[in-house]
């Protein structure tokens, strides 16, 4: 099979003379048409520091493609800054952007018959959006993560974006003066790169490396370091070779490799968003994977990395300690990874890890050996019960009070809940319920970092529960339960909760989310329930609300056959 087996559809033959004329206008020569056309999906943007450092990575990839005797074709992808839109209506566009990014890449690459695609992204939804596109198309592809941000510093402490969100709560409680508050705001983000803890972008990049769709060590590099540029160039070279070997995403994205990715997510204490996104990626790759599979992996994989938000360290610390290859080698030796999975380099996981030390380096406590795991089981639990029969997601490690029963404080939007928190109307033992924020009801399934961080800042992170049909940021921690499904908008049980009802979150053994009322009362409330009108009837939010499926299936917009 020729290297240009796709692009020749628009470059070969007499009938394609007009097509070739367009390429000549771009500087192509006749000889170039024999070489593969490689798309570079460039997420560079000055909207957010997560993406502001991507252009030099794209430039390195473009040059490497040319040196490899292939033709780079550059196109842009949009991004939304989760950190900047957090707590506003703009956050409704965040999950929507995952679908838009996937659609943009698919549209450009398929419309132009590209032979392979290098995806370069930074902010949270860039990650799954790009991978979903590669899995859908099954055209040779590789993911180049833009890299993590370095930590900020103030008064001898490392800072991340979450430090600022939590400072809001401390400041409103009078526990922090204005000088410290402003200093944290100004020092938390020192440059370009994605949020520094094991938040969503770093979680997904680590998982992509574990799955074999990104190069070893690339997921924990800092954006501003030169090794990130070198890695982008090497990624492009590897992708051109994959095109020549016809190594495709679905050769790599398999049930076994997704299990590897989720094992690494559990071992590193990754984001709850990974549940939603891997359901979507598996759907795109046509891999049989459902929400209960996360619980299967969680029960056998310990947490061995002490990383923010619930731990002490950031991604650059993990990189210095050996990165994801070190984590994977520990898991492989413990029989917790599939070593025979193929990776984008053509090597298997076991071959890739052959020269990685069996144990983490001495003198660090970022990565722990299995026998000294921080927690014996993973942290992302799937809870079920009469409030979430399809399942919901909770981070359960590190909780002092993993079981709480308390009165429901019910809010039909994040904004109303945030106002109550800032007015200090939430008390110890309350269970905050934020609904009408699901994929369809929001629409867009906003992240709730602002209210959860405000609760933590007010000292209520361990004593107040919070449940929502929306999402949480990768920076969230505490007694929080998200992705409650079915959502309020379609008549899920969360729609039937009333102010003051007794609600139980059991994140310890039973893994239940319960509304403590009788079956008869539940049935009566359901009979009286009426579906609310959509908040939007035009535009992309209306489109997403109409097409998105339930969170328990990834909230994708193309699940037409299911």
From Swiss-Prot:
Binds 1 [2Fe-2S] cluster per subunit. This cluster acts as a Lewis acid cofactor. The keyword Manganese does not apply. The active site is at residue 473. Mg(2+) binds at residues 82, 124-125, 447. It catalyses: (2R)-2,3-dihydroxy-3-methylbutanoate = 3-methyl-2-oxobutanoate + H2O; (2R,3R)-2,3-dihydroxy-3-methylpentanoate = (S)-3-methyl-2-oxopentanoate + H2O. Its EC number is 4.2.1.9. [2Fe-2S] cluster binds at residues 50, 123. Functions in the biosynthesis of branched-chain amino acids. Catalyzes the dehydration of (2R,3R)-2,3-dihydroxy-3-methylpentanoate (2,3-dihydroxy-3-methylvalerate) into 2-oxo-3-methylpentanoate (2-oxo-3-methylvalerate) and of (2R)-2,3-dihydroxy-3-methylbutanoate (2,3-dihydroxyisovalerate) into 2-oxo-3-methylbutanoate (2-oxoisovalerate), the penultimate precursor to L-isoleucine and L-valine, respectively. Belongs to the IlvD/Edd family. This is Dihydroxy-acid dehydratase 2. It comes from Bordetella pertussis (strain Tohama I / ATCC BAA-589 / NCTC 13251).
